[in-house]
């Protein structure tokens, strides 16, 4: 997956971009904590190895938590290797490998975005604000990229029983 696909599909995060890769499914598993997990060839998240710039993220939870914390405007491309890769990438790569190649900071820039989504019509809303800044020194020796996110979701009671299926 390349950056032009992120723009065409309006993907803001790694989890949204992965939905357009065949054989990869991103599922929202917990309405309380809001985590999503990636499934490659139907296997759960802990069976997938996540790499950032070809370096492994050593955690069985890497395929579960953090997929919403990598914005697509920091990603150059995503390489997905489906199938057993445990001989090359370790025991966490039974389902496959997702290699996130980040962009090199080449110019100072800043961006901000805000997204509002309705949940169940106009009964509840989900607000997400993202800030992204890149700083590069004049001699191009040092580059720094920062990302921040503020997320708020109002509770939503679909069944009307007084209990929220989607708490804050």
Predicted regions and their residues:
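Short acidic/polar hinge/loop motifs at secondary-structure boundaries
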Residues: 55-82
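Short, polar/charged loop or turn motifs at beta-strand boundaries
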Residues: 1-11, 38-43, 53, 118-120
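N-terminal Sec signal peptide and the immediately downstream disordered periplasmic leader
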Residues: 1-9, 15-19, 23, 134
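Extracytoplasmic beta-strand/coil segments of soluble accessory domains associated
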Residues: 15-59, 76-77
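Periplasmic-side early beta-strands and strand-to-turn transitions of outer-membrane beta-barrels
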Residues: 108-110, 115-121, 128-168
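Membrane-embedded beta-strand positions in outer-membrane beta-barrel channels/transporters
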Residues: 37, 77, 97, 128-132, ...
């Amino acid at each position: 997956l390349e950056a032009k696909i992120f723009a065409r599909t309006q993907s803001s995060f790694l989890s949204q971009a992965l939905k357009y890769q065949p054989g990869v499914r991103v599922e929202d598993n917990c309405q309380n904590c809001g985590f999503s997990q990636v499934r490659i060839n139907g296997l759960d998240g802990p069976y997938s190895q996540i790499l950032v710039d070809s370096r492994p993220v050593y955690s069985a939870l890497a395929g579960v938590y953090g997929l919403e914390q990598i914005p697509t405007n920091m990603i150059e491309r995503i390489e997905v290797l489906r199938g057993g890769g445990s001989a090359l990438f370790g025991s966490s790569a039974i389902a496959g490998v997702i290699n996130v190649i980040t962009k090199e900071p080449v110019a100072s820039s800043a961006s901000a975005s805000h997204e509002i989504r309705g949940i169940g019509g106009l009964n509840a809303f989900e607000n997400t604000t993202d800030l992204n800044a890149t700083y590069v020194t004049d001699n191009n020796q040092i580059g720094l990229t920062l990302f921040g996110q503020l997320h708020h979701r109002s509770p939503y009671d679909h069944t009307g029983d007084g209990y929220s299926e989607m708490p804050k």
